[in-house]
């Protein structure tokens, strides 16, 4: 049987909101597989989708640069080890160099960008500051109109590309994406695999109702439709005017959303947590 650690139980609790014993039991039954434990819990308890894996725990900033004619824009993420360094003017100057290079070269290839003198600057900054600095990723969008939005703390940045429309509309939609975090532009972008997995979970939940098969099928179809609407940008209520769907707002402007990119600092990265009390206790014993 797989060993179930306290950190595994803690992560499952944070992602599901369920109690410690329930999470531990689910992990034991899933032989330590957190994703399988979540799927089993959803089937058995009707729990909503869990939070995404990979808590945001790395520091750093995101930055964007948009062309004067709003035809293209770039976004980059640069990580530091601490929030203190993420506010350092030397670090922020380096971030400016990175986003500037990506913009000038119209490139999202981090490895290629670093070969243009940025790697030497990064190494010098690491020596000066005493923390590891990492240029994690970059993206570029180009279209009729490209808008960008950076949240005030420089931890969330969005690019959105439109056919038609204008810069103000693009920025409003980018702000919405930052706030609501849709996973797809349209339900048509959701893979059959994702839908099939959700359908399996919803059917397992609905089967527990004891209702006839045709009623269960209708229940599942309704839940799938709601799920797709919640994760699709065009079907979400616009954050600045909840009475209007984003898709209707875009259509009224004679525009079309063709692409979006949303960066949040550290998403998918988890720094090693150090239990200082345990570390000290171990040293005292040793």
Swiss-Prot record:
Residues 82-85 are annotated as: Involved in Mg(2+) ion dislocation from EF-Tu. InterPro entries: EF-Ts_dimer_sf, Transl_elong_EFTs/EF1B, Transl_elong_EFTs/EF1B_dimer, Transl_elong_Ts_CS, UBA-like_sf. SUPFAM superfamilies: Elongation factor Ts (EF-Ts), dimerisation domain, UBA-like. GO terms for molecular function: translation elongation factor activity. It is found in: Cytoplasm. Associates with the EF-Tu.GDP complex and induces the exchange of GDP to GTP. It remains bound to the aminoacyl-tRNA.EF-Tu.GTP complex up to the GTP hydrolysis stage on the ribosome. PANTHER family: ELONGATION FACTOR TS, ELONGATION FACTOR TS, MITOCHONDRIAL. This is Elongation factor Ts. It comes from Hahella chejuensis (strain KCTC 2396). The lineage of its organism: Bacteria, Pseudomonadati, Pseudomonadota, Gammaproteobacteria, Oceanospirillales.
């Amino acid at each position: 049987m797989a060993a179930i650690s306290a950190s595994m139980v803690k992560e499952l609790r944070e992602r599901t909101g369920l109690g410690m014993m329930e999470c531990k039991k689910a992990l034991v039954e899933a032989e330590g597989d957190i994703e399988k434990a979540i799927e089993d819990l959803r089937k058995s308890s009707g729990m909503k989708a869990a939070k995404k894996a990979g808590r945001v725990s790395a520091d750093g900033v995101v930055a964007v640069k948009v062309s004067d004619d709003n035809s293209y824009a770039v976004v980059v993420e640069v990580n530091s080890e601490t929030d203190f360094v993420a506010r350092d003017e030397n670090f922020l100057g380096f971030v400016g160099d990175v986003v500037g290079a990506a913009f000038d070269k119209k490139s999202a290839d981090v490895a290629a960008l670093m070969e243009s003198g940025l790697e030497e600057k990064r190494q010098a900054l690491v020596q000066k500051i005493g923390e590891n600095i990492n240029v994690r990723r970059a993206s570029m969008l180009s279209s009729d109109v490209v808008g960008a939005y950076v949240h005030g703390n420089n931890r969330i940045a969005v690019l959105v590309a439109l056919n038609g429309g204008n810069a103000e509309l693009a920025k409003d939609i980018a702000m919405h994406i930052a706030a609501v975090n849709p996973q797809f532009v349209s339900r048509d972008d959701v893979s059959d695999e994702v839908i099939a997995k959700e359908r399996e979970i919803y059917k397992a939940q609905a089967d527990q109702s004891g209702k006839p098969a045709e009623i269960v099928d209708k229940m599942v179809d309704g839940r799938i439709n709601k799920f797709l609407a919640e994760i699709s940008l065009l079907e979400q209520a616009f954050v600045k005017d909840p009475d209007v769907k984003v898709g209707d707002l875009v259509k009224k402007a004679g525009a079309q959303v063709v692409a979006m990119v949303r960066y949040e600092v550290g998403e998918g990265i988890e720094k090693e947590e150090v239990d200082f009390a345990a570390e000290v206790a171990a040293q005292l014993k040793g």
